[in-house]
């Protein structure tokens, strides 16, 4: 779920090794192109087509830190149905969080004990009713074994579609969702289990 590749760029600049995964080849190619610059450090970037629910090429307890910003169900579709594994094609929220739980279990497997996993997640509306998608996802990460270290609220500014939604919210009598949650989870170290 590398998306546009900005995390990979920052990792390269900051001399961090990074493994970038996505099921969408266009996202991976965009990331590869964005990494075509020189830096004076020894950072390594690994860009792999892979479903986050099955990262078999990564060993147990191999990863030091996870940072991900998965789709919020089908709010934004990152492929138009042509990629079966694309989580952004799932409309039903319960089905979506069932699949995210599989991601959480796999992230727990690959993360080293005592290390952290950060996930940026927002909420949505269905039939004009607020859907706490972020909290449903948080619950699945907790169920997978993670502990919640922090819930950082990120305010959203200057979103591309804000004008459209301001008009729609006034017409339909609902408030805009102006925040996302950055959940920081920790995998217990083996001495604390």
Q: What does each of the following model-derived ranges do?
A:
Residues 1-193:
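Class I S-adenosyl-L-methionine-dependent methyltransferase catalytic core
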């Amino acid at each position: 779920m590398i998306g546009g590749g900005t995390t990979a760029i920052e990792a390269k600049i900051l001399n961090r090794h990074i493994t970038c995964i996505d099921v969408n080849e266009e996202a991976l190619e965009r990331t590869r192109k964005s990494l075509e610059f020189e830096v004076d450090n020894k950072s390594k970037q690994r860009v792999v087509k892979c479903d986050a629910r099955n990262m078999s090429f990564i060993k147990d307890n191999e990863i030091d830190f996870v940072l991900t910003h998965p789709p919020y169900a089908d709010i934004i579709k990152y492929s138009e149905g042509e990629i079966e594994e694309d989580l952004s094609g799932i409309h039903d929220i319960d089905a979506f969080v069932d699949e995210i739980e599989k991601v959480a279990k796999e992230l727990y497997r690959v993360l080293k004990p005592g290390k952290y996993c950060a996930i940026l997640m927002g909420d949505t509306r269905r039939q004009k009713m607020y859907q706490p998608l972020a909290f449903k996802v948080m619950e699945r990460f907790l169920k997978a074994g993670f502990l919640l270290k922090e819930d950082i609220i990120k305010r959203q500014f200057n979103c591309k579609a804000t004008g459209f939604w301001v008009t729609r919210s006034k017409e339909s009598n609902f408030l805009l969702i102006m925040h996302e949650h950055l959940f920081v989870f920790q995998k217990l170290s083996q001495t604390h289990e």
